């Protein structure tokens, strides 16, 4: 099906029956439109095949990862030489209001953001290079590249 979406990848996740798809790179505001269309198509295709699709953070309780939307983004300053400092400044700014932001992540986040299974707790904020347990994970290659443009 050609829906004009920039689907750049798919992969299986940890929870049984859990799959992930990636959209992008796409600029703003087009990314918001593409995400809404992709989710709508996901539900309609599942309906056509008499299966269910859910965005519930942890639809199957158990000792495994939950599911949640995560995004990769950058600003012009983050992509320039010395951009790591802009990344840290952005992380620090987000951390100042983390409790406000997390209130808008949807119902059930406490089931997914437990501090286990490659997540930070929903009530704790952190960031770090290659830290899969942080709220914000900064890619290792970005940190070690001579220039963010090399990443």
Model-derived regions: residue spans:
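Glycine-rich anion/phosphate-binding loop at the beta-strand->alpha-helix junction
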Residues: 30, 35-141
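Histidine-centered active-site/metal-ligand motif
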Residues: 11-13, 68-72, 150
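Single conserved hydrophobic/aromatic residue that forms the stacking wall/gate
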Residues: 143-151
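Active-site acidic/histidine clusters and adjacent loop/turn architecture
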Residues: 1-36
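Short, ordered beta-strand-loop transition motifs
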Residues: 12-15, 138-142
């Amino acid at each position: 099906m050609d829906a004009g979406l920039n689907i750049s990848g798919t992969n299986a996740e940890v929870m049984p029956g859990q799959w992930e798809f990636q959209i992008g790179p796409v600029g703003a505001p087009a990314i918001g439109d593409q995400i809404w269309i992709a989710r709508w198509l996901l539900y309609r295709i599942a309906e056509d095949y008499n299966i269910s699709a859910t965005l519930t953070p942890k639809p199957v309780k158990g000792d495994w990862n939950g599911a949640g939307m995560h995004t990769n983004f950058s600003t012009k300053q983050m992509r320039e030489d010395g951009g790591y400092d802009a990344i840290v400044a952005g992380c620090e700014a987000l951390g100042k209001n983390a409790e406000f932001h997390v209130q808008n992540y949807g119902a059930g986040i406490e089931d997914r953001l437990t501090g286990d299974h490659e997540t930070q707790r929903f009530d704790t904020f952190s960031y770090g290079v290659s830290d899969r347990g942080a709220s914000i994970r900064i890619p290792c290659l970005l940190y070690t590249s001579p220039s963010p443009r090399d990443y």
